[in-house]
Amino acid sequence: MLHQQEPIIALATPAGKSAIAVIRLSGQNVISIVNQVFKGKDLNQQPSHTIHFGTINYQGEMIDEVLIALFKAPRSFTQEDSVEISCHGSSYIIQKIMQLFMELGIRLAKPGEFTQRAFLNGRFDLIQAEAVADLIAADTAIAHKTALQQMRGGFSTQLQALREKLIHVGALLELELDFAEEDVAFADRAMLESLIQELLTIIGKLIQSFSLGNVIKNGLPIAIVGKPNVGKSTLLNALLQEERAIVSPIPGTTRDFIEAEINIGGIHCRFIDTAGLREHTTDTIESIGIARTKERMQQAGLIIYVFDLSDESLATIQNAIEGISELGIPYIKVGNKLDAAQPDLLKALSQEDFVFISTAKKQHLGQLEARILELFQLDQLDNSDTIVVNTRHYESLVKSQNALLAVVEGIINGLSNELLMIDLKQTLYYLGEITGEITTEDLLDDLFSKFCIGK
């Protein structure tokens, strides 16, 4: 049921001087309140989705010429009566207009309160509400496409289908309980297990997609590591196409890390050029840099390990690869200085999964970028794929997967329907958390507080 809440106001456009600013109002009687200070047409008599020119006046003094956009309930973003005032973007004018309406009883909106009201009034579910924030924050084509797909209900539809199938399974189990005395079997155990395994496959794919979704939403931190003087800084400069890092033939020049962002295939890749790794150094500052490199490796989403094809031995390279593989972090092996490579070493490494480049001559850098996209399956991204980008969704999916696995285990062990229903209802609960069908006031307050004011 729709309900009009107390009227709220917020600046919907960024603060600061601009040609135009938009002030947003929503809630009970906002159209009548705006009409009190608007000189133009009687707004109370105008239809929804219309725009009207006039002036905002206070105590006989004009504050500004404005355009008023009317949105009457339920045909608005919040599904309440809403008004958007387009005025000149002077900070004085904005402050004066907002102060005027606050004196008339309209309070300042909390962060995300407009979207929260839209959710509470049933305009969309919690997934779609969160997608609004993701859409505003999107600064790459992939992030925009993913947020738009979720805002339009793609993920919600998939979860709803899952819930309906689970409810069907639950209904079969409940029927058997109702007819327990007649010993009627409505749910063949093998059929039930097969159906649940099908649902587990769908949930599993959604969980797996989070590693990609996290990269799409938050970017990919990439640590460039290797021994001193293998060309790490030259690689960073080549990728950036500018001289950002100091390049020197003297080993150990990079004492600290240098960060730079590059957009590769629509993904924000944050490259970190680290101090060269070597076991023995008498330089205290270099030792600190090496320690920081190891910290950065642990924090990275991807490691690019650079080897010098002109100088290093096969045994040294193999030992380094063995060490880095133990970290459990995705990595790409890069052989640099291809133009001066040792023939025997190049031949031996050609049998392995290496990317061979020459940073000095800027050769094959595109192959490295392609490998990054391939590693995270960004080269195979389908517009219809549902990708989990939100940590909250991921955690609830993992919990629902565990609960559903408990149902399968119960079926195998011959547990009663009453016990199976406990885990099945728990699965439905966790899926309901994602869409907002199951939620708490604290969760909503925390979630919407992360939105910008005015949205």
UniProtKB/Swiss-Prot annotation:
Its cofactor is K(+). One of its GO terms (biological process) is tRNA methylation. GTP binds at residues 229-234, 248-254, 273-276. It comes from the Bacteria. InterPro entries: G_TrmE (IPR031168), GTP-bd (IPR006073), GTP-bd_TrmE_N (IPR018948), GTPase_MnmE (IPR004520), MnmE_dom2 (IPR027368), MnmE_helical (IPR025867), P-loop_NTPase (IPR027417), Small_GTP-bd (IPR005225). (6S)-5-formyl-5,6,7,8-tetrahydrofolate binds at residues 24, 84, 123, 455. Keywords: Cytoplasm, GTP-binding, Hydrolase, Magnesium, Metal-binding, Nucleotide-binding, Potassium, tRNA processing. The keyword rRNA-binding does not apply. Residues 219-377 form the TrmE-type G domain. It is an enzyme of class 3 (hydrolase). Its main location: cytoplasm. It is found in: Cytoplasm. K(+) binds at residues 229, 248, 250, 253. Binds 1 potassium ion per subunit. Its EC number is 3.6.-.-. One of its GO terms (molecular function) is metal ion binding. The keyword Metal-binding applies. Mg(2+) binds at residues 233, 254. GO terms for cellular component: cytosol. Belongs to the TRAFAC class TrmE-Era-EngA-EngB-Septin-like GTPase superfamily. TrmE GTPase family. Exhibits a very high intrinsic GTPase hydrolysis rate. Involved in the addition of a carboxymethylaminomethyl (cmnm) group at the wobble position (U34) of certain tRNAs, forming tRNA-cmnm(5)s(2)U34. Homodimer. Heterotetramer of two MnmE and two MnmG subunits. This is tRNA modification GTPase MnmE. It comes from Amoebophilus asiaticus (strain 5a2). The lineage of its organism: Bacteria, Pseudomonadati, Bacteroidota, Cytophagia, Cytophagales.
